Amino acid sequence: MEEDTGIDEAKTYTVEKSEKVEPEKDGLSQFRDEEKSLGADMEDLHDETVRETLGKDQVQGVRENSSVEPNVEDVLEVNETDSVKETVVSAIVPVDEVEENRQVETSPSLAASSDSLTVTPCLSLDPATASTAQDLPLVSVPTKQEQRSDSPVVNRLSVTPVPRTPARDGYNWRKYGQKQVKSPKGSRSYYRCTYTECCAKKIECSNDSGNVVEIVNKGLHTHEPPRKTSFSPREIRVTTAIRPVSEDDTVVEELSIVPSGSDPSASTKEYICESQTLVDRKRHCENEAVEEPEPKRRLKKDNSQSSDSVSKPGKKNKFVVHAAGDVGICGDGYRWRKYGQKMVKGNPHPRNYYRCTSAGCPVRKHIETAVENTKAVIITYKGVHNHDMPVPKKRHGPPSSMLVAAAAPTSMRTRTDDQVNIPTSSQCSVGRESEKQSKEALDVGGEKVMESARTLLSIGFEIKQC
């Protein structure tokens, strides 16, 4: 009996427990059902907002792309939810126009234009103010034809650069300079003729884009144009149209401007006579040179050679003096300033360079130790002093008489190249050869050279001519 009562109690306990669990399961399932229904409501609300937005976009696309305004009825609908109250403007559009709008949107050319349009956002209004939304004015979107008529038409032009090099005139030119010009803005290129001893030059003026605007010829060619196997017709016209620079023998230089864009054939007839006259004048001068007598031409040639030898400023007199090593820098009576030093091949001792301190005096000298005798020095003078010997300073002492006599030819304006050897021995034989050389020095250098030679002879030195 006790066992039966225990089983009954257990059954009642399980029944009570199951009754308690069933309400809990029912509450959980009900909560899940509510969540599902709420999610479905949210999805429906989202789908409705997406459809309304697509409808507005289609309305605006149809208004933009259609040439005739469609019959569109704007309906104001108020959708109220538990949390948000929204007012959405939707439009009723025919199906064929929507399909046409979809085809237009797929074209890439109109996709960029549709991106620039602004979409009017939805207005959140209260139910009391919802009636005022019907009074909002509709914004008219311009049609495609109006946009085409209002937009400016841009023509893209391709600029073809003109070649910088102008037509050849038959001569060979070498460029030697270029500079920028402000007025007119551009650049100038400078050329000279490559022919030897030809002074002809030309200037090419170019604009900003590099096109040659004009050519300025300076000087006259002293030769014929170099021969070529073939010429283009344009080169022949330009060569014929160049105006001769000098009209007569007295004119040295003249400018002639030839615009690069102009046709030179118009001025060819005017210049043919002048160029022919120039050729005749050249031939006449050549004939006169051929008919000139031989002695007269020889005399002119000698005079030109002598004038060339006198007019050469780069050549300087050169005197080489061998003296003892104890001779000072200012031992010749002049004042010197050292301006350089360098090593010479074959001599372990450096060579020192000096210039005369007198203003405007071109005389230079360099002193180096002799290779065979380290106690002797070799002094080389270049140039002639154009001033008197300065008064010696006390600190330098009196100048050496032997060195002064040896450097005496540098104090006169002569152009003879002599070499004076001053041996270290005090006794030398003076014979007929020294007397003959002294007479030659008298003829070339004058009385002062003779006096210096007599001084050297009196102290026992020998002068040798190179």
From Swiss-Prot:
Keyword Acyltransferase recorded: no
DNA-binding annotation, residue ranges on this chain: 162-226, 325-390
Name of one Pfam family that matches: WRKY
Main location: nucleus
Key word DNA-binding present: yes
Molecular function, one GO term: metal ion binding
Domain of life: Eukaryota
Localization in the cell: Nucleus
Binding site for Zn(2+): 193, 198, 221, 223, 356, 361, 385, 387
Comp. bias (Polar residues): 419-429
Region (Disordered): 1-45, 140-166, 284-317, 410-439
Record-level GO cellular component terms: nucleus
InterPro entries from the UniProt entry: WRKY_dom, WRKY_dom_sf, WRKY_plant
Basic and acidic residues biased stretches: 8-38
Functional summary from the UniProt entry: Transcription factor. Interacts specifically with the W box (5'-(T)TGAC[CT]-3'), a frequently occurring elicitor-responsive cis-acting element.
Family per similarity comment: Belongs to the WRKY group I family.
Protein name, entry field: Probable WRKY transcription factor 32
Organism of provenance: Arabidopsis thaliana
